[in-house]
Amino acid sequence: MLRTILGSKIHRATVTQADLDYVGSITIDADLVNAAGLIEGEKVAVVDITNGARIETYVITGDAGTGSICINGAAAHLINPGDLVIIMSYLQATDAEARAYQPNIVHVDADNRIVALGNDAGEPIPGSSLLSSRSL
């Protein structure tokens, strides 16, 4: 039996562009793609913190150092520039692999620059006002 678990997360990224006239997908700055361990074409879930929208799409790697997070295609009706999003990938693993796996967590600032890397999906950026989901 395989379990589906969190593979990686880019936490609280700011959407920089939304383009209806594109075939589909999400374009993500190459620095963030690499830090999260994502690959071109990989399926991701995008959760909009601002309005609650949730979509599934695939990754297009954008130019490094730009901070770009661009929602392409029909999803641009749901997610807008300036919205805060969480981008998550999932992987399938055996029970033993799943219990040992540590996801790649990428925390970013308002300009989508990496401010912290980690492996605990429930912990906020150290020093932020966000609450840990482990303290609930």
From Swiss-Prot:
<keyword id="KW-0963">Cytoplasm</keyword>
<keyword id="KW-0210">Decarboxylase</keyword>
<feature type="binding site">
    <location>
        <begin position="73"/>
        <end position="75"/>
    </location>
    <ligand>
        <name>substrate</name>
    </ligand>
</feature>
<feature type="active site" description="Schiff-base intermediate with substrate; via pyruvic acid">
    <location>
        <position position="25"/>
    </location>
</feature>
<feature type="active site" description="Proton donor">
    <location>
        <position position="58"/>
    </location>
</feature>
<keyword id="KW-0456">Lyase</keyword>
<dbReference type="GO" id="GO:0004068">
    <property type="term" value="F:aspartate 1-decarboxylase activity"/>
</dbReference>
<keyword id="KW-0670">Pyruvate</keyword>
<keyword id="KW-0865">Zymogen</keyword>
<dbReference type="GO" id="GO:0006523">
    <property type="term" value="P:alanine biosynthetic process"/>
</dbReference>
<keyword id="KW-0704">Schiff base</keyword>
<protein>
    <recommendedName>
        <fullName>Aspartate 1-decarboxylase</fullName>
        <ecNumber>4.1.1.11</ecNumber>
    </recommendedName>
</protein>
<dbReference type="GO" id="GO:0005829">
    <property type="term" value="C:cytosol"/>
</dbReference>
<keyword id="KW-0566">Pantothenate biosynthesis</keyword>
<dbReference type="Pfam" id="PF02261">
    <property type="entry name" value="Asp_decarbox"/>
</dbReference>
<comment type="function">
    <text>Catalyzes the pyruvoyl-dependent decarboxylation of aspartate to produce beta-alanine.</text>
</comment>
<comment type="subunit">
    <text>Heterooctamer of four alpha and four beta subunits.</text>
</comment>
<comment type="similarity">
    <text>Belongs to the PanD family.</text>
</comment>
<keyword id="KW-0068">Autocatalytic cleavage</keyword>
<dbReference type="GO" id="GO:0015940">
    <property type="term" value="P:pantothenate biosynthetic process"/>
</dbReference>
<feature type="modified residue" description="Pyruvic acid (Ser)">
    <location>
        <position position="25"/>
    </location>
</feature>
<dbReference type="InterPro" id="IPR003190">
    <property type="entry name" value="Asp_decarbox"/>
</dbReference>
<dbReference type="InterPro" id="IPR009010">
    <property type="entry name" value="Asp_de-COase-like_dom_sf"/>
</dbReference>
<feature type="binding site">
    <location>
        <position position="57"/>
    </location>
    <ligand>
        <name>substrate</name>
    </ligand>
</feature>
<comment type="pathway">
    <text>Cofactor biosynthesis; (R)-pantothenate biosynthesis; beta-alanine from L-aspartate: step 1/1.</text>
</comment>
